[in-house]
A protein has these predicted regions:
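A residue-level signal for conserved active-site and pocket-lining positions in enzyme catalytic cores
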Residues: 9, 38, 67, 104, ...
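ATPase catalytic-site recognition across NTP-hydrolyzing enzymes
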Residues: 44-105
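Short beta-strand scaffold segments in enzyme catalytic cores
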Residues: 110-117, 253
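Short loop/turn segments immediately following beta-strands, especially the blade-tip
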Residues: 117-123
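Short, hydrophobic alpha-helical segments
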Residues: 255-263
């Protein structure tokens, strides 16, 4: 039909996306296409506090796309804001109310497990805090020896035994190892393995000052510092990290993307209702 119309709204993604081609036609003067561009700053009804919260939660390509509204490639360092002086601690920032853990399984590749302390803010009144307290990391290329699933299971049981671990998340594809963990009495939970969403959530938590790493986690720190976007895949429209030296950081991503922290909020009933109304659609609230 010559009078058919289509209306669409979206956040920008990679610049070779088909929708970007339609927008380019509008910019070039094709009267069959019309573009309206708005950013969060154009909305007069959004409080400045909310805008600042979103700015603080975004970094790199996520900030450029989701806040500035730019069509850009995912390139460079993923944790481009990472600073050892800020994000690496000698001791936990709070007392752990409980722990979670996550595993990135590897046989010929490194096997990584991270132990994460969680504070909901109940005792600190400072909101949630998460920190990677310890890491288990076995690299068969370095040790020149692989391990069986039963050996890994024994190691993980000993690694986690001293702690109040509420949940253990694992790569969903590690079926045989999950069965071995079940055999030794440990229940595992399939992790959310949506890579881009997991990266964005992990970056956001660290950017907002909710997520830290203790200095003893040498492998994780090294991986965070060298975790980069795959430029060749980005040019083809695929937002993916380089699959190299990413085992501990993948385990961290599993935990952050899957576990929901119930933040302690000691408000009165009316204050809770007001907070709910203010934040009903605020997906970036702490």
């Amino acid at each position: 039909c010559s009078h058919s119309k289509a209306h669409a709204t979206m956040n920008p993604t990679y610049p070779t996306h088909k929708v970007k081609g339609w927008i380019d036609k509008a910019i070039e003067g094709d009267k069959n296409y019309y573009e309206l561009k708005f950013t969060l700053d154009d909305n007069p009804y959004v409080p400045d506090e909310y805008k600042q919260r979103i700015r603080d939660s975004l970094s790199g390509v996520f900030y450029k796309r989701n806040y500035l509204g730019l069509w850009c490639l995912a390139e460079g360092a993923i944790f481009d804001f990472f600073d050892k002086k800020i994000h690496v601690l000698r001791k936990p920032p709070a007392a752990a109310e409980y722990y979670i853990a996550a595993i990135d399984y590897g046989a010929s590749n490194p096997f990584a497990c991270v132990l994460i302390g969680v504070s909901t803010g109940q005792y600190t009144q400072e909101g949630k805090k998460l920190w990677v307290e310890r890491e288990y990391y076995w690299d068969p290329q370095v040790t020149q020896r692989g391990k069986t699933n039963s050996e890994f299971a024994k190691d993980i049981v000993e690694f986690l035994e001293p702690y109040n671990v509420r949940s253990l998340y694992i790569d969903p594809s590690a079926a045989a190892f999950k069965r071995e963990m079940q055999r030794v009495g440990i229940t595992t939970i399939d992790a959310n393995n949506e890579v881009l969403d997991g990266i964005q959530m992990t970056v956001s938590e660290m950017q907002q000052g909710n997520l830290y790493v203790l200095e003893g986690c040498k492998n994780l720190i090294k991986e965070i510092e060298t975790y980069v976007w795959d430029k060749k895949k980005a040019e083809k429209g695929d937002d993916e990290p380089v699959k190299k030296n990413d085992h501990a950081v993948d385990a961290l991503r599993y935990a952050i993307a899957t576990h929901k922290v119930s933040v302690y909020k000691p408000y009165k009933h009316q204050e809770i209702a007001d907070e709910w109304r203010r934040n009903k659609y605020d997906h970036y609230r702490k």
